[in-house]
């Protein structure tokens, strides 16, 4: 059952947005954290379901789909599952000849959807089905080709609802208010941070000191002060994979303190990683046979040297990997900000240094900061943070989508 959303309690900006959505077949809803995207989507679903409209919900990743299920109370699927992918061929069963049976399709985290996947999704929609695309255009674009959400907005061919009002409860969060400052190109407010604040900057200039401070924060200070599990609840997000502050080096350092090697503990070394019971791991590619997807995070539950298998617990599911399949997972004490898209974590820690210079961009830092729910800690150099906040010139992608939208979409959506 959809979560209750009384339209009488909507803010004026949300009520105007609701009229726009209900009056158009295709609509984009965009906005940052705390601006009421979830409330608006729930209102749309409540009204249309009350009228007997069948609504389907989807998102590009498993974790994003799970979050959508939690916030709406309705089942949400990954786009691949919704389109009924055939694991053997990689093709979708749902297409223009076998369309989805729904009157409305809601797509969350649309900024993560690339051009080919969006093309497949639109092909599977019946002609009269409504489409609501929800996302934050200021986040990182998809890993795959194109900038679907940004191009749709820039094209001007579909109505765009821009939610900008940060509501009172969200405005109490320094994570949210500072995320919006960064989105506007302003440095976050770090003056005399209250110890009880949910946003902190710990200044360290030397990379070795950044690592030492980060490890102590993750392993001791954050779990003690905020009563969080250092493995399950605290996530380190890195701008890059390589270097002393990259994913690989930090995973090695964090594994040593979070889940140290024990002689009596079975373990396996494959593809540059050592896996043992209790390790936090991430799926690095879609595996439709196993029903696990790129970005899913789990905990190693069993290492069986006889069967040559590792079992990983992803939420309620136990997934088994042959030793030869362990290139599908890697340690996840630290992951890239790109890999974190579509996910939220109770506590997020982000190292920042000028050695990340080529990747220090506003949308990268903004995306990382908005992953934290209860606590966000930046560790490193203020200069690096300043570079990122000022750098609003991400590499332009030329997929041809924008021109196609401008030329063709008016006729297609008429």
Where are the model-predicted features located?
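C-terminal accessory regions
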Residues: 184, 282, 294-414
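Conserved adenine-nucleotide phosphate-binding loops and their immediately adjacent elements
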Residues: 1-6
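Residue-level recognition of short, solvent-exposed, well-ordered loop/turn junctions
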Residues: 126, 276-277, 293, 340
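Conserved helicase motor core of SF1/SF2 NTP-dependent helicases
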Residues: 23, 43, 47-53, 59-71, ...
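Structural motif
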Residues: 28, 58, 104-108, 237, ...
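Conserved helicase motor core of P-loop NTPases
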Residues: 137-290, 301
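Conserved RecA-like ASCE P-loop NTPase motor core of nucleic-acid helicases/translocases
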Residues: 27-69, 134, 199-206, 218-243, ...
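N-terminal pre-P-loop "Q-motif" helix
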Residues: 8-23
